[in-house]
Every structure is written in structure tokens, then in C-alpha cells.
Amino acid sequence: MELNGKIALITGGAQGIGRIISEDLARQGAHVILGDINFDGAEKTVAEIKGRGGKASAVQLDVSSAADVQSVFDSIIKEYKPVDIVVNNAGITRDGLLVRMKEVDWDLVLNINLKGSFLCSQQAAKQMMKQKSGVIINIASIVGIMGNFGQANYSASKAGLIGFTKTLAREVAPRGIRANAVAPGFIDTEMTQVLEKSVREKLIEQIPLARLGQPEDVARCVSFLVSENASYITGQVINVNGGMLM
């Protein structure tokens, strides 16, 4: 297994895309650490991974808190070793029309989706620079490229994450660290399952491959990007959207 001996932190790993990414990396031999504000959910996923023979642990993590993030990274290096892989997946939505959007909803989405990735990447880079290796993957979104009605805050956070990824990649490349973004389209998760059937059908009509994506589609892309097969790929945004945006 290619990731044997690797330590991988996945934020927002308790459910959805993060859970599937965690399971996939564990199958390849990594010790996955699920950082999530939903600690009970993270522990449940950890138990499932361990039940299949994988290595996993859970930590409670509020990615928008600098103190929380530093504490988690300090504990990783104390209990294991410097982190090898970080997947910044934690994210939320608070949708609403721009003219009606509350400042608190703008701030919350930007703090978790963008600031959280900055804080985790900053701590990861400090550890990775010392060992002159590592991979950081930021989970962006198709919405960060094309925008979406009623998602000014979410779109801004994901567009910012894409720009952040490119700058991060330039800064850490001389130390042997790679950074890429994965931009999923509309994926069949809790976020899309709440949509009305008619809305889902209209979305699918816009997708050339005629289906919503599955979390596994995103996880396989992440697994490729953290592998040695992608050793010459950095600063890129990989779209996983069924052709909805080309």
C-alpha cells in the first residue's frame, strides 16, 4: 500500500466527502486523523475504518480557531510524527440572496471555508518544511469558478481558496511540498440531498455525464493527487464535475 507510514489529516472527515476521502486514504495504508467539530461523528467513522483493518483516530477541531488548529497539529507531531498529508475539506453553506444575507452568515462561511484552510495549511507547511516533503489538498468547488445563485458567501470562499492554493503552491514548492485544489461539481451528499427533486433534475440536465457525482469520484482524485503518480503536479485545480464546467 503506497501510503503506508503516512500521517494524513482530513478536516471535516466525519461525514460526506470527507468521510469517503478518509476511508480511501486509510485503505491505502495511511493513518488518517479525522478533524471535525462533530467529534461523535468522527469517532463513528474512525470505528468503521478500524473495523476494516485501517488506522484512524479522531480529534475535535474547529478549523476557524487558530488555537484549536495549532493544538491539533502539536498533538499530531507529539503522538505520531510530522503530518505528511492534509486535506482541507471542512466547509459549510449558509445560502441566501446577497441583498438579504446576514453579515454573520457571510463571516461564518468565510471563516470556516477559507480561513480554516489558511490556518491548517499554515501549520501543515511549518511541519512539512522541516521534512522537505508533504502534500496539501484543498477541497474547492465548481461554484468558486462559475458562481451560483444565492451563494455569494460560499462562492467567494471557494474562489478565494483556489487563489490561495496557487500562492501556497508557489511558496512551498522549493521545500518539496505540493499543493493542489479539487473542485467538485454537484455531488450526491447531504448538501444536495436536501434539494427538491425538480431542482436535482434540472442540475442533472446541465451535466453531460447525466448524473450527480459520488463522493468516491472526489476521493479517487484526492488519492491520485497525494500519490507519487502526481509528483510533478502542483498549483492546479482539478475539476470533478461530470463535464458541467469545461
Where are these regions (language model features)?
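Residue(s) in the substrate-gating loop at a strand-loop-helix junction
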Residues: 141
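Canonical Rossmann dinucleotide-binding motif of NAD(H)/NADP(H)-dependent dehydrogenases/reductases
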Residues: 2-33, 168
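C-terminal substrate-recognition "lid" of short-chain dehydrogenase/reductases
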Residues: 2, 121, 211-240, 244-245
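Active-site helix of classical SDR
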Residues: 121, 157, 165
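Substrate-binding pocket helix/loop in short-chain dehydrogenase/reductase
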Residues: 97-98, 102-110, 192, 203
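The beta1-alpha1 cofactor-binding region of Rossmann-like NAD(H)/NADP(H)-dependent oxidoreductases
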Residues: 39-40, 60-71, 103, 216-217
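Alpha-helical segment proximal to the catalytic Tyr-Lys
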Residues: 126, 170-174, 231
